[in-house]
Regions:
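Short beta-strand edge/turn micro-motifs at domain boundaries
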Residues: 142-164, 175-221
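C-terminal or late-domain output modules
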Residues: 4-7, 12-15, 55, 77-78, ...
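Short Pro/Gly-enriched beta-strand edge/turn motifs at strand-loop
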Residues: 93-95, 165-172
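Gram-positive cell-envelope targeting signals
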Residues: 1-77, 123
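Hydrophobic beta-strand residues in large extracellular and virion-surface proteins
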Residues: 23, 107-109, 121-125, 188-190, ...
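Solvent-exposed, acidic/flexible segments
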Residues: 50-53, 65, 87, 91, ...
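Short solvent-exposed beta->alpha transition segments
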Residues: 74-149
Length: 222
C-alpha cells in the first residue's frame, strides 16, 4: 500500500514538472513582448518629437523663401525681426526684386542635434541661393552713369526717386545678368516654448541669404 502511494505521488510530480516549465516560458515571452513594445513606443515617441524642430526649421525656411516676414516672426522665440531694419529687403521699392531672387533659393536639412530632456535642438540647413554681387555692381555702375547725366541737365533726384530708380535698375539687371549661385550652411538653434518649437532668433547669416549678399545699395552710392 505504501509503495503504491509513493509511486503515485512520484508519477504526479513528473506530470506537473513540464507544466511549470511551460508556464515559465510563456511568462518570459509575454515579458519580452511587453519590453519590446515599451522600447518601440519610446523610440517612436523620441523620433516623433525629434521631427518637430526639423519641421519648424523647414517652415521657417519656406517663409524665408516666400519673404513672408510675419510667418518668420511667428516662428521666432524672440519675436524680433530688427535684424532686417537696415536691409534693403524691407523696402517696398525692392520687394518685387527680392521676391524673384529668393524664389530661387533651395535647401536641405543636413544635420540635427536633439535634446529631448531640456527641449532644445540645433538644425543645420544647407542653402543654395543667388549671390547678387554682380547684379549690384551692374546696377550701381548704370545708376552712377544716369546720375551724372541728370546732374549735367541741372536736375536732382529726391530720396524717393533715387530709391525707385535703383529698384527699376535692379529688376532690369537681374533679368540680364546670369544667375550666380552660392551655398552656405546655417545652424539654427531651436527651443520648445509653451508646447511649440521655435527658432531662437533671426541671425545675420539668414539676413545675408535673403538679401542675396547685398549690403545696402544706397550706402554704396553715398
Amino acid at each position: 500500500m505504501d509503495t503504491n502511494n509513493q509511486e503515485f505521488f512520484e508519477d504526479e510530480e513528473v506530470q506537473k514538472t513540464p507544466v511549470r516549465k511551460k508556464k515559465k516560458k510563456k511568462g518570459l515571452i509575454i515579458f519580452l513582448v511587453i519590453l519590446v513594445l515599451v522600447i518601440a513606443g519610446g523610440a517612436g515617441y523620441y523620433f516623433y518629437e525629434r521631427q518637430k524642430p526639423i519641421e519648424t526649421t523647414k517652415d521657417y525656411l519656406e517663409n524665408m523663401r516666400a519673404m513672408n516676414f510675419d510667418g518668420m516672426k511667428a516662428l521666432l522665440q524672440s519675436n524680433d525681426m530688427s535684424a532686417l531694419d537696415d536691409a534693403d529687403i524691407t523696402s517696398n521699392a525692392y520687394t518685387s526684386f527680392f521676391k524673384k531672387i529668393n524664389e530661387k533659393m533651395s535647401y536641405k536639412i543636413t544635420k540635427t542635434s536633439f535634446h529631448i530632456q531640456n527641449g532644445t535642438a540645433s538644425v543645420t540647413a544647407h542653402i543654395r541661393y543667388i549671390d547678387g554681387a554682380n547684379i549690384y555692381k551692374e546696377t550701381i555702375t548704370e545708376f552712377l552713369k544716369q546720375i551724372v547725366s541728370t546732374a549735367f541737365s541741372g536736375s536732382t533726384l529726391t530720396e524717393e526717386e533715387t530709391e525707385q530708380k535703383l529698384a527699376t535698375l535692379l529688376e532690369e539687371k537681374s533679368s540680364t545678368v546670369e544667375d550666380k549661385f552660392t551655398e552656405t550652411d546655417i545652424t539654427y538653434p531651436v527651443i520648445e516654448a509653451d508646447g511649440q518649437w521655435k527658432i531662437v532668433t533671426l541671425d545675420a547669416d539668414t539676413v545675408r541669404v535673403m538679401s542675396a549678399n547685398f549690403t545696402n545699395v544706397q550706402d554704396e552710392i553715398d
